[in-house]
Amino acid sequence: MILSQTMVAEAEIRVLDVKCHISAPKDQKNFQIDEVRVSESVRAEISGSAETPRFGSGMSCVTTTIGESASDFIPTIRSGSFADIRSRETMEDEHICIDDLSAHLGSYNFSVPSAFYGVFDGHGGPEAAIFMKENLTRLFFQDAVFPEMPSIVDAFFLEELENSHRKAFALADLAMADETIVSGSCGTTALTALIIGRHLLVANAGDCRAVLCRRGVAVDMSFDHRSTYEPERRRIEDLGGYFEDGYLNGVLAVTRAIGDWELKNPFTDSSSPLISDPEIGQIILTEDDEFLILACDGIWDVLSSQNAVSNVRQGLRRHGDPRQCAMELGKEAARLQSSDNMTVIVICFSSVPSSPKQPQRRRLRFCVSDEARARLQAMLAGE
């Protein structure tokens, strides 16, 4: 069992605003948010098709116009994590928590706040997930040529940022093919979250999941890359792959992963059903965004996104500790009979948890006649 908690201070940064349209998955019939708009200074139109959605449960944001934000909101980053082997013989999960990138990397001129997180759920042994934990920071911020931080976050920077993420995942995949201690049957999922000022970027390959809490409502920031995800199923079948009992080519439960070169080697890079390329989602954080949960399938196999958000939100209102919230979410998954390795990271965007407003008591006023007042005074005087 591993617990950790860190915290950094807030600072000011120029950012952009994005207008988003959100639609919930079929199992969340009550949830429908037509529009989230931060300010009029910047607009972003929604694009994408049913075949290539960009976000987890239907959220899509694509920037078309960039400007300086009129909002004063700057997130204050603090996080906590929890990991447990459960009933498995080995622990194949690993994770990264960096609440202050500038302090961690030193030579980079990051905006403040800046933070980076990752969850890696290994299979076929722990080596692939360990490799990601030990090397991904270097791959992201050195080998993939992380873009220079501009004075104002614009569309060009966001495109470069997305490209550097894709390159980092590809470099990790290729490096693992050359790593002698990682066997060809060993691999890992990879879920990362990068925060720069108010900008949040989530990259995912596999079935770990990132879930944002927006005023108590769960917003999936990533897809689960499994046979149940229809766009992935079609992609696999178009490339000649197949599913047997939900497993890719009868072997693997996920359709995207780092490593697993025994499955990738018979194909060229463009035709392998199993790929390492991440799906990427970007969003601008607002005052409505309370926290982000990153967790492996040991959590999501037994808890819905909304149940997890409600659990963490209640915990933050009780004690305000993201580390304890991560542990409590893991314990809830264990109570629901999850036997898999589990890893949870809870990332808060404010220093003080939001509390529900208490209803004001109604003030009652009474009018008393002179006769009634005289009788009351006489009663009190004992007459």
From Swiss-Prot:
Co-factor(s): Mg(2+); Mn(2+)
Stated name of the protein: Probable protein phosphatase 2C 13
Alphabetical list of Gene3D superfamilies matching this protein: PPM-type phosphatase domain
Organism phylogeny: Eukaryota, Viridiplantae, Streptophyta, Embryophyta, Tracheophyta
Family to which the UniProt record says this protein belongs: Belongs to the PP2C family.
Disulfide bonds: none
Binding locations of Mn(2+) 1: D121, G122
Domain PPM-type phosphatase: 78-349
UniProt keyword terms in alphabetical order: Hydrolase, Magnesium, Manganese, Metal-binding, Protein phosphatase
EC primary class: hydrolase
InterPro entries to which the protein is assigned, alphabetical: PP2C (IPR015655), PP2C_BS (IPR000222), PPM-type-like_dom_sf (IPR036457), PPM-type_phosphatase-like_dom (IPR001932)
Reaction catalysis annotation: O-phospho-L-seryl-[protein] + H2O = L-seryl-[protein] + phosphate; O-phospho-L-threonyl-[protein] + H2O = L-threonyl-[protein] + phosphate
